């Protein structure tokens, strides 16, 4: 049921001087309140989705010429009566207009309160509400496409289908309980297990997609590591196409890390050029840099390990690869200085999964970028794929997967329907958390507080 809440106001456009600013109002009687200070047409008599020119006046003094956009309930973003005032973007004018309406009883909106009201009034579910924030924050084509797909209900539809199938399974189990005395079997155990395994496959794919979704939403931190003087800084400069890092033939020049962002295939890749790794150094500052490199490796989403094809031995390279593989972090092996490579070493490494480049001559850098996209399956991204980008969704999916696995285990062990229903209802609960069908006031307050004011 729709309900009009107390009227709220917020600046919907960024603060600061601009040609135009938009002030947003929503809630009970906002159209009548705006009409009190608007000189133009009687707004109370105008239809929804219309725009009207006039002036905002206070105590006989004009504050500004404005355009008023009317949105009457339920045909608005919040599904309440809403008004958007387009005025000149002077900070004085904005402050004066907002102060005027606050004196008339309209309070300042909390962060995300407009979207929260839209959710509470049933305009969309919690997934779609969160997608609004993701859409505003999107600064790459992939992030925009993913947020738009979720805002339009793609993920919600998939979860709803899952819930309906689970409810069907639950209904079969409940029927058997109702007819327990007649010993009627409505749910063949093998059929039930097969159906649940099908649902587990769908949930599993959604969980797996989070590693990609996290990269799409938050970017990919990439640590460039290797021994001193293998060309790490030259690689960073080549990728950036500018001289950002100091390049020197003297080993150990990079004492600290240098960060730079590059957009590769629509993904924000944050490259970190680290101090060269070597076991023995008498330089205290270099030792600190090496320690920081190891910290950065642990924090990275991807490691690019650079080897010098002109100088290093096969045994040294193999030992380094063995060490880095133990970290459990995705990595790409890069052989640099291809133009001066040792023939025997190049031949031996050609049998392995290496990317061979020459940073000095800027050769094959595109192959490295392609490998990054391939590693995270960004080269195979389908517009219809549902990708989990939100940590909250991921955690609830993992919990629902565990609960559903408990149902399968119960079926195998011959547990009663009453016990199976406990885990099945728990699965439905966790899926309901994602869409907002199951939620708490604290969760909503925390979630919407992360939105910008005015949205």
UniProtKB/Swiss-Prot annotation:
Q: Which Gene3D superfamilies match?
A: P-loop containing nucleotide triphosphate hydrolases, Probable tRNA modification gtpase trme, domain 1, tRNA modification GTPase MnmE domain 2
Q: Which cofactor does it need?
A: K(+)
Annotated keywords: Cytoplasm, GTP-binding, Hydrolase, Magnesium, Metal-binding, Nucleotide-binding, Potassium, tRNA processing
- Organism, scientific name: Amoebophilus asiaticus (strain 5a2)
Q: What is the lineage of its organism?
A: Bacteria, Pseudomonadati, Bacteroidota, Cytophagia, Cytophagales
Q: Name one GO molecular function term.
A: GTPase activity
Q: Which PANTHER family match?
A: TRNA MODIFICATION GTPASE GTPBP3 (PTHR42714), TRNA MODIFICATION GTPASE GTPBP3, MITOCHONDRIAL (PTHR42714:SF2)
- Provide the function of this protein: Exhibits a very high intrinsic GTPase hydrolysis rate. Involved in the addition of a carboxymethylaminomethyl (cmnm) group at the wobble position (U34) of certain tRNAs, forming tRNA-cmnm(5)s(2)U34.
Class of the enzyme per the UniProt entry, highest EC level:
hydrolase
The Gene Ontology biological process terms listed for this entry are: tRNA methylation; tRNA wobble uridine modification
**Major localization listed first in the record, in broad terms:** cytoplasm
State how the cofactor is bound: Binds 1 potassium ion per subunit.
Concerning PROSITE patterns, the annotation shows: G_TRME
- Similarity comment: Belongs to the TRAFAC class TrmE-Era-EngA-EngB-Septin-like GTPase superfamily. TrmE GTPase family.
Q: Which residues form the TrmE-type G domain?
A: 219-377
Q: What is this protein called?
A: tRNA modification GTPase MnmE
């Amino acid at each position: 049921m729709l309900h009009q809440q107390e009227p709220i106001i917020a600046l919907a456009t960024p603060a600061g001087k601009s040609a135009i600013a938009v002030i947003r109002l929503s809630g009970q009687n906002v159209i009548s309140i705006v009409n009190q200070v608007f000189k133009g047409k009687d707004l109370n008599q105008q239809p929804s989705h219309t725009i009207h020119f006039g002036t905002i006046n206070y105590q006989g003094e004009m504050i500004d010429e404005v355009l008023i956009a009317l949105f009457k309930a339920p045909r608005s973003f919040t599904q309440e009566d809403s008004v958007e005032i387009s005025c000149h973007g002077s900070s004085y004018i904005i402050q004066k207009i907002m102060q005027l309406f606050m004196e008339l009883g309209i309070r300042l909106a909390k962060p995300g309160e407009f979207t929260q009201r839209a959710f509470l009034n049933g305009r969309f579910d919690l997934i779609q509400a969160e997608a609004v924030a993701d859409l505003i924050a999107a600064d790459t084509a992939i992030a925009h496409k993913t947020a738009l797909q979720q805002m339009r209900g793609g993920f919600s539809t998939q979860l709803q289908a899952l819930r309906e199938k689970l409810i069907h399974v639950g209904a079969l189990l409940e029927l058997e309980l109702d007819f327990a005395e007649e010993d009627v079997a409505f749910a063949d155990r093998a059929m039930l297990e097969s159906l649940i395994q099908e649902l587990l496959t769908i949930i599993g794919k959604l969980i797996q997609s989070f590693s990609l979704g996290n990269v799409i939403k938050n970017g990919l931190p990439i640590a460039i590591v290797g021994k001193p003087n293998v060309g790490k800084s030259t690689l960073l400069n080549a990728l950036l196409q500018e001289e950002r890092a100091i390049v020197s033939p003297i080993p150990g020049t990079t004492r600290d890390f240098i960060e730079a962002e590059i957009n590769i295939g629509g993904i924000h890749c944050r490259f970190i050029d680290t101090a060269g790794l070597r076991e023995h150094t008498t330089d205290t500052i270099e030792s600190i840099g090496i320690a920081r490199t190891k910290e950065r490796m642990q924090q990275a989403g991807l490691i690019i390990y650079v080897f010098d094809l002109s100088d290093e031995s096969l045994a040294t390279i193999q030992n380094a690869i063995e060490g880095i593989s133990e970290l459990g972090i995705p990595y790409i092996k890069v052989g640099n200085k291809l133009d001066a490579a040792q023939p025997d070493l190049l031949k031996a490494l050609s049998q392995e999964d290496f990317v061979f480049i020459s940073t000095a001559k800027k050769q094959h850098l595109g192959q490295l970028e392609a490998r990054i996209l391939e590693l995270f399956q960004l080269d195979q991204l389908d517009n219809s794929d549902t990708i989990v980008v939100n940590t909250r969704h991921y955690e609830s999916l993992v919990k629902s997967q565990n609960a559903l696995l408990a149902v399968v285990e119960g079926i195998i062990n011959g547990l009663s329907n009453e016990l199976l229903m406990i885990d099945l209802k728990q699965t439905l609960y966790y899926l309901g958390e994602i869409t907002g069908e199951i939620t708490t006031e604290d969760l909503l307050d925390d979630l919407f507080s992360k939105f910008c004011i005015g949205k």
